[in-house]
């Protein structure tokens, strides 16, 4: 019998009347089960968190940081054990899975240190109005309250930790809703916080069926802030449900790599392949299309093709570069995009092969803007080359996307690179590097349908706190 994992609620590990079985995407093996919470159980989670917040926010930043450092140490200690489970649960290469756990520990440590550095300020009224020179404002940041953190399947530990740590160090309490496929990993993350000795109710987990609690956990009046990573349609729905409450949304992307004629093509090819095919393309920041000057396209396609042909395809425990996609629905969607490109005349440089959820890397040249692959986010190991004749055309195609997460520009002309970066409608532009999240002290954000709000440790702390001003009139 497989293990029954429990939710961490108000300092206790709890089962529910119903459960959800979790299976490995690569093999179909049953990995265990997680509780399927009811709405009444969600009520208890939120009530417990609310009750714990007063004492938690009363602690100093230094005291809260001690708990976070302990949790980070535990994650580092157990990185290989947790990584092995994570690798099976989401079909991620073992080394990458362990790396995700380690990076999460690093984020938690950094968040603890960043919180300790937070400072308030004192303002003098006379700086604006001579008649107010006797007024002084003390400005501080305060926690928003209860943060609902919703993490995605592709980084169920890292993109949980990047929400939890800034929230906790700020004096907030947290309810983590991990993805169904990734929920075991999320509960293992919770074990680290539990062992670190956080006071009961400060950090809690919620697992369950979307049909039962999906909207309920978001709409609940107890929630003060919603921090979500996932698809754009779900993010838009959450935004509607949130009403006037603040939200952080990290959503989809269609990141372009723009390759100019003077670019180092070996460097570009290396970054394109790493950016497009890492974790089988299941990353919001993956390179999802290459906009290349026609005069150098043949050379670049040849270099990229050679590197793609060297990628290994197989199982996560073997550290294969390309592993099975998260489920059959995802693989079917990717296949649909590929067939559309085939039917409309794209050149298949590396042909489509599929075995179950495992899709071998696919490379297309001569993709045109009437093809779905030019615009839709595949979340799979397929990359389209779109040939362009000018910088202006590349910018125009990139900006026509409904998404605006990131872009890359490869060129040795740095004044031109900055000029292009200014015109691209995205949150981040990488020069001579692949699109990617991080480092985690940098701001991370999306324009248009790629998100709302700014992440990055310091920015997340600011987002999950609110400013309070106390004004003294010393003349009185």
UniProtKB/Swiss-Prot annotation:
Substrate binds at residues 103, 154-155, 283-285, 437. Keywords: NADP, Oxidoreductase. The keyword Oxidoreductase applies. Optimum temperature is 60 degrees Celsius. It catalyses: D-glyceraldehyde 3-phosphate + NADP(+) + H2O = (2R)-3-phosphoglycerate + NADPH + 2 H(+). One of its GO terms (molecular function) is lactaldehyde dehydrogenase (NAD+) activity. It comes from the Bacteria. Gene3D superfamilies: Aldehyde Dehydrogenase, Chain A, domain 1, Aldehyde Dehydrogenase, Chain A, domain 2. Optimum pH is 8.5. NADP(+) binds at residues 151, 177, 180, 215, 230-251, 377. InterPro entries: Ald_DH/histidinol_DH, Ald_DH_C, Ald_DH_CS_CYS, Ald_DH_N, Aldehyde_DH_dom, ALDH-related_metabolic_enz. The keyword Ribonucleoprotein does not apply. The active site is at residues 250, 284. Its EC number is 1.2.1.9. Coiled coil: none annotated. Induction: Up-regulated by the catabolite control protein A (CcpA). Catalyzes the irreversible NADP-dependent oxidation of glyceraldehyde-3-phosphate to 3-phosphoglycerate. Is not able to use NAD instead of NADP. May play an important role in NADPH production in S.equinus. Homotetramer. Belongs to the aldehyde dehydrogenase family. S.bovis does not display glucose-6-phosphate dehydrogenase (G6PDH) and 6-phosphogluconate dehydrogenase (6PGDH) activities, indicating that it does not have the hexose monophosphate pathway. This is NADP-dependent glyceraldehyde-3-phosphate dehydrogenase. It comes from Streptococcus equinus. The lineage of its organism: Bacteria, Bacillati, Bacillota, Bacilli, Lactobacillales.
């Amino acid at each position: 019998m497989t293990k029954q994992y429990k939710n961490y609620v108000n300092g206790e590990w709890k089962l529910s009347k119903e459960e959800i079985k979790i299976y490995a995407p690569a093999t179909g093996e049953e990995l265990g089960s997680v509780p399927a919470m009811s709405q009444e159980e969600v009520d208890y989670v939120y009530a417990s968190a609310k009750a714990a917040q007063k004492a938690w926010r009363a602690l100093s930043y230094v005291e809260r940081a001690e708990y976070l450092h302990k949790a980070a140490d535990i994650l580092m200690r157990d990185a290989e054990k947790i990584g092995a489970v994570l690798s099976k649960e989401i079909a991620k290469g073992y080394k990458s899975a362990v790396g995700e756990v380690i990076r999460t520990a690093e984020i938690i440590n950094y968040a603890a240190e960043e919180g300790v550095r937070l400072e308030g300020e004192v303002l003098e009224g006379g700086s604006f109005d001579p008649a107010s020179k006797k007024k002084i404002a003390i400005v501080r940041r305060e926690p928003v309250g209860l943060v609902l953190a919703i993490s995605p399947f592709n980084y169920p530990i890292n993109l949980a930790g990047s929400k939890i740590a800034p929230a906790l160090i700020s004096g907030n309490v947290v309810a983590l809703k991990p993805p169904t496929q990734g929920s075991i990993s999320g509960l293992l993350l919770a074990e680290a916080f539990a062992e670190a000795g956080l006071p009961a109710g400060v950090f809690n987990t919620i697992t369950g069926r979307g049909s039962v609690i999906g909207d309920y956990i978001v709409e609940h009046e107890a929630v003060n802030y919603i921090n979500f990573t996932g698809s754009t349609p779900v993010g838009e729905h959450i935004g509607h449900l949130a009403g006037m409450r603040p939200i952080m949304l990290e959503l989809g992307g269609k990141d372009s790599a723009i390759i100019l004629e003077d670019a180092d093509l070996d460097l570009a090819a290396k970054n394109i392949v790493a950016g497009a095919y890492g974790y089988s393309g299941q990353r919001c920041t993956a390179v999802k299309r290459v906009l290349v000057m026609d005069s150098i396209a043949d050379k670049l396609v040849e270099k990229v093709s050679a590197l793609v042909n060297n990628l290994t395809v197989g199982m996560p425990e073997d550290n294969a570069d390309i592993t099975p996609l998260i489920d059959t629905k995802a693989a079917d969607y990717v296949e649909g995009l590929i067939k559309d490109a085939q039917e409309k005349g794209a050149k298949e440089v590396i042909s489509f092969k599929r075995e179950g959820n495992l899709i071998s890397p696919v490379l297309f040249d001569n993709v045109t803007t009437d093809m779905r692959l030019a615009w839709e986010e595949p979340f799979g190991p397929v990359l389209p080359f779109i040939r362009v004749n000018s910088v202006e055309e590349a910018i125009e195609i990139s900006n026509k996307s409904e998404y605006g997460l990131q872009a890359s520009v490869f060129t040795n002309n740095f004044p031109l690179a900055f000029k292009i970066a200014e015109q691209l409608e995205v949150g981040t532009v990488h020069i001579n590097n692949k699109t990617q999240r991080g480092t985690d002290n940098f701001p991370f954000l999306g324009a248009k349908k790629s998100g709302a709000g700014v992440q990055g440790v310091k920015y997340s702390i600011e987002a999950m706190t609110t400013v309070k001003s106390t004004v003294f009139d010393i003349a009185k």
